[in-house]
């Protein structure tokens, strides 16, 4: 490993969170009933309901079913018809340039512009639109593309497939460029690496500050590569079943946190094949046999200050973990139906760091029971309950100053944007005719653009 590569993965010092108690996981710890000092967001449990202008739409939804009117801003149908799009991600500087990457069941990925033609946005972005920007088809996979994402600076993209490959593409820069992105500057891409793992890719994660990729695999291994060289930094192998999730924890991303169907959560120094710590989250010490359908970890998130991890399980449980040592914390988060898996987790700092610590921090969990819960991290209280008619597949948060907005995607063919402070439904996004597998939120312009990945092979876009 070069000195430059080591610098990208330098170890971080994480401080133990002293707000909540550490306990042994005996399943009998009561929820903390102390009053929450964060009065601004303290309220009784709220079942998500209609927001302004949503009442009529909700009244009509039951009758319309699959015939809901399409209220999207535009549609992109690049993947093969009726073959699922599994993953969607927007450029980190979207809308400059306003491009996205998708991956699907047709063994392909696409770099494309989701902005419809003849729109005000395309005119303000050097005439970027679905008509003027030629999509780039990302080939090379021999099975479904299930993961895709951008490097931290948006100069590279990576796709991960069920064929065991991670393929990396890099932008071919023109000789002359401008501050305002143009079609010519972003239309040319070149494959630079085809990385082999020999087993199905489950998840893929770019480092937030460097050109490093981590990928979790079906055979329980986790791979790390440096780009653009393609050098293997490490192969981590302390899980015993499929690695289901992984991320570089905030605030600096110097460590790697991974989860598995074997119920293990592991913190790594990416340069070291040995774990910093390893914890069994949902597997009781006296359990006779590991059952991934009961004990497996299916979702993972870390708080903005890097002190607490949240893990969701295949049996509907959610637990908080100290990032310092991997201990289960006392706060209980009980709400999802037993036997229904937790599909997505998201920490949101509603005060944007103004209060310090975990004051104002909430956790949003979404599951196959069709519900999303907004939890107060310090007390475990449910602040709001959000509902879909079918399982929720994923969710995404909106950037500052709209941190209070979260958009959920569902098997009921809709996406919904919520104000998680109150549980109010801000908008219902319709147009899909099947399961919505993915959602991406514009990282700029106040997060007012929502882009989806659909089971019927199309991607839709809405303005919030």
Regions found by a protein language model. Give the residues of each.
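Acidic, serine/threonine-rich intrinsically disordered low-complexity regions
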Residues: 1-73
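A short helix->beta-strand "capping" segment at the edge of beta-propeller domains
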Residues: 58-87, 127-135, 187-189
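Beta-strand-rich domains and repeat architectures in extracellular enzymes and scaffolds
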Residues: 77-108
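WD40/WD-repeat beta-propeller blade N-cap
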Residues: 78-85, 131, 138-145, 194-201, ...
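Loop/turn segments within WD40 beta-propeller blades
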Residues: 89-97, 148-154, 160, 204-211, ...
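Conserved strand-to-loop turn within each blade of WD40 beta-propeller repeats
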Residues: 103-106, 160-163, 216-219, 259-262, ...
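WD40-repeat beta-propellers
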Residues: 109-114, 166-171, 222-226, 246, ...
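Solenoidal tandem-repeat scaffolds enriched in leucines and small polar residues
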Residues: 206-325, 329-330
């Amino acid at each position: 490993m070069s000195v430059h590569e080591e610098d990208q993965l330098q170890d971080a010092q994480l401080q133990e969170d002293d707000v909540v108690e550490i306990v042994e996981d005996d399943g009998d710890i009561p929820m903390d009933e102390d009053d929450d000092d964060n009065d601004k967001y303290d309220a009784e449990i709220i079942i998500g309901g209609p927001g302004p202008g949503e009442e009529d739409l909700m009244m009509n939804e039951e009758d319309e079913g699959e015939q809901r009117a399409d209220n999207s801003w535009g549609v992109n149908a690049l993947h093969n018809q009726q073959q699922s799009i599994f993953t969607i991600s927007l450029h980190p500087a979207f809308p400059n340039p306003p491009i996205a990457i998708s991956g699907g069941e047709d063994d392909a990925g696409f770099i494309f512009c989701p902005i419809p033609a003849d729109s005000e946005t395309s005119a303000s972005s050097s005439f970027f639109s679905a008509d003027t920007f030629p999509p780039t088809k990302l080939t090379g996979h021999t099975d479904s593309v299930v993961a895709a994402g951008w490097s931290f600076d948006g100069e590279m993209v990576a796709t991960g497939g069920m064929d065991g490959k991670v393929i990396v593409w890099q932008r071919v820069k023109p000789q002359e460029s401008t501050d305002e992105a143009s079609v010519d500057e972003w239309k040319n891409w070149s494959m630079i690496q085809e990385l082999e793992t020999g087993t199905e890719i489950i998840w893929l994660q770019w480092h937030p500050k460097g050109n490093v990729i981590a990928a979790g695999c079906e055979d329980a291994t986790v791979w790390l590569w440096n780009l653009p060289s393609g050098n293997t930094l490490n192969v981590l192998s302390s899980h015993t079943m499929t690695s289901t999730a992984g991320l570089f924890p905030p605030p600096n991303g110097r460590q790697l946190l991974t989860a598995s169907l074997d119920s293990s959560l592991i913190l790594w120094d990416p340069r070291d094949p040995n774990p910093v710590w390893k914890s069994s989250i949902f597997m009781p010490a006296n359990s006779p046999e590991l059952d991934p359908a009961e004990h497996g970890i299916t979702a993972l998130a870390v708080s903005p200050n890097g002190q607490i991890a949240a893990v969701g399980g295949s049996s509907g449980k959610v637990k908080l973990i100290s990032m310092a040592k991997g201990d289960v914390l006392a706060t209980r988060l009980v709400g999802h139906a037993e036997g229904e898996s937790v599909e997505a987790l998201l920490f949101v700092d509603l005060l944007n760091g103004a209060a310090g610590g975990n004051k104002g921090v909430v956790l949003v969990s979404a599951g196959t029971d069709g519900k999303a819960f907004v939890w107060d991290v310090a007390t475990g209280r449910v602040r709001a309950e959000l509902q879909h008619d079918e399982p929720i597949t994923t969710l995404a948060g909106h950037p500052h100053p709209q941190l209070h907005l979260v958009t959920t995607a569902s098997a009921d063919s809709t996406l919904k944007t919520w104000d998680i402070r109150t549980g109010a439904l801000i908008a219902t996004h319709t147009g899909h005719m099947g399961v919505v597998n993915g959602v991406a939120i514009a990282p700029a312009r106040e997060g007012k653009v929502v882009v989806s990945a659909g089971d019927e092979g199309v991607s839709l876009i809405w303005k919030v």
